[in-house]
């Protein structure tokens, strides 16, 4: 629901606009826009552990009702028992008044057994299994080396249990250009996987290319979906190099050409049910980003809703925002939509330059920049 709130002005109403000829300025009224939507969920989130977990989880909990929590810790969350323990740590780190619900995932390995999928389904806290091709991204060294050769029985059990597979969609062959790895993954892994197991529910995570958009749109609704990050909607690969090397715009998959960004924006603002919010918010201490070997990951959780609202507002599609942020994700997972609401106000505000914590600093996406939308607290 979009509301336009008008502040009173005696010279405006049913009368015509009056011009002050001496200054040639129009006397007009102040307008404030508010947008109330069903409270969103984040279908791809990194919360880390230890001090970092305690620092960042309140940012996500302040705006999102639920989140699919990534399992790429050290060591990774490869079992249901480990997922239950990790969830307890998250719950302890939440503010006392929070109703945030972390939805856990398992880290798929070459050694994962079908029995683990049955345990995960029975647990009531594990909602998906994450596929990291070994070496594709942060803490993925324990990931899958041969999906069809070593994981097929597990994938077949996932079909039986209606357990979604969340896919980091990049090949890791060093001979393949980093900007082509998503496209090649679709051709060599994802398309054969869908053909072999058409009943497997798959989420292609953090899509970055028009190739991914076209693939998802070609699939049967409800069988393949995609999460989309704010950075891949707002930035292209020029943002990595403008004004010098920009480590806080570095993530995996890397930003792509402008034509790909435009294709993703068009897809998510079209009203398609196949695309939904997944920030891939990935906090790293500033010293680990601004270094000779900077970590991949963009921290967007504190400002994510403002960023998504910016995308939809600029596309003239604010009426499509709620479906993307709040409906498409739970519908795909077969979960109820949230009953709670959140209101966004169009009022300029400045993103903090940095978030300070006892252990160090975290620089958010769009640090120091002005955004137009913000959630009301």
Swiss-Prot record:
- Cited PROSITE patterns: DIHYDROOROTASE_1, DIHYDROOROTASE_2
Residues annotated with N6-carboxylysine modification: 130
GO MF, any single term? metal ion binding
Per the UniProt record, which residue ranges are transmembrane? none
The protein's enzyme class? hydrolase
Domain of life, per lineage:
Eukaryota
Residues annotated as binding Zn(2+) 2 are 130, 168, 206
Q: Gene3D superfamilies this protein is in?
A: Metal-dependent hydrolases
Q: Where in the cell is it found?
A: Mitochondrion
Q: Which reaction does it catalyse?
A: (S)-dihydroorotate + H2O = N-carbamoyl-L-aspartate + H(+)
Residues recorded as binding Zn(2+) 1, renumbered to this chain, are 44, 46, 130, 280
Required cofactor(s): Zn(2+)
- Look up the record and name the pathway of this protein: Pyrimidine metabolism; UMP biosynthesis via de novo pathway; (S)-dihydroorotate from bicarbonate: step 3/3
Q: Which UniProt keywords apply?
A: Hydrolase, Metal-binding, Mitochondrion, Phosphoprotein, Pyrimidine biosynthesis, Transit peptide, Zinc
Q: Which PANTHER family match?
A: DIHYDROOROTASE
The record, for HAMAP family, names: PyrC_classII (MF_00219)
Instruction: Please give the family membership noted in the entry.
Output: Belongs to the metallo-dependent hydrolases superfamily. DHOase family. Class II DHOase subfamily.
Q: What is this protein called?
A: Dihydroorotase, mitochondrial
Q: Which organism is it from?
A: Arabidopsis thaliana
């Amino acid at each position: 629901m979009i509301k336009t709130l008008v502040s009173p002005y005696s010279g405006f109403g049913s009368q015509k606009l009056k011009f002050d000829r001496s200054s040639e300025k129009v006397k007009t009224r102040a307008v404030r826009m508010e947008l109330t939507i069903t409270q969103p969920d984040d279908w791809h989130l990194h919360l880390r552990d230890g001090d970092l977990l305690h620092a960042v989880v309140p940012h996500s909990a302040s705006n999102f009702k639920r989140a699919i929590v990534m399992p790429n810790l050290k060591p990774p969350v490869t079992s249901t028992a480990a997922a239950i323990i990790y969830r307890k740590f998250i719950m302890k780190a939440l503010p006392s008044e929070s109703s945030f619900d972390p939805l856990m995932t398992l880290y798929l390995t070459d050694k994962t057994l079908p029995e683990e999928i049955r345990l995960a389904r029975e647990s009531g806290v594990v909602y998906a299994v994450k596929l990291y091709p070994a070496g594709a991204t942060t803490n993925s060294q324990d990931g899958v080396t041969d999906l069809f050769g070593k994981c097929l029985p597990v994938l077949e059990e996932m079909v039986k249990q209606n357990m979604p597979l969340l896919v980091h969609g990049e090949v890791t062959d060093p001979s393949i250009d980093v900007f082509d790895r998503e496209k090649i993954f679709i051709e060599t892994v994802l398309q054969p996987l869908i053909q072999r197991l058409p009943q497997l529910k798959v989420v292609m995570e953090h899509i970055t290319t028009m190739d991914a958009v076209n693939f998802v749109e070609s699939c049967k609704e409800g069988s393949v979906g995609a999460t989309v990050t704010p950075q891949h909607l707002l930035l292209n690969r020029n943002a990595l190099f403008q004004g010098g090397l920009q480590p806080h715009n570095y993530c995996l998959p890397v930003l792509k050409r402008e034509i790909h960004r435009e294709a993703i924006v068009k897809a998510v603002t079209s009203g398609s049910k196949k695309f939904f919010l997944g920030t891939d918010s990935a906090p790293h201490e500033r010293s680990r980003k601004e270094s000779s070997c900077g970590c991949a990951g963009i921290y967007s959780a504190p400002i994510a809703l403002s960023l998504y609202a910016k995308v939809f507002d600029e596309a003239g599609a604010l009426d499509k925002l709620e479906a993307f942020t709040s409906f498409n994700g739970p519908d795909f997972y077969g979960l109820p939509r949230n009953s709670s609401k959140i209101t966004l106000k169009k009022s300029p505000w400045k993103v903090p330059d940095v978030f300070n914590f006892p252990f160090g600093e975290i620089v958010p996406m769009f640090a120091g920049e002005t955004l137009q939308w913000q959630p009301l607290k």
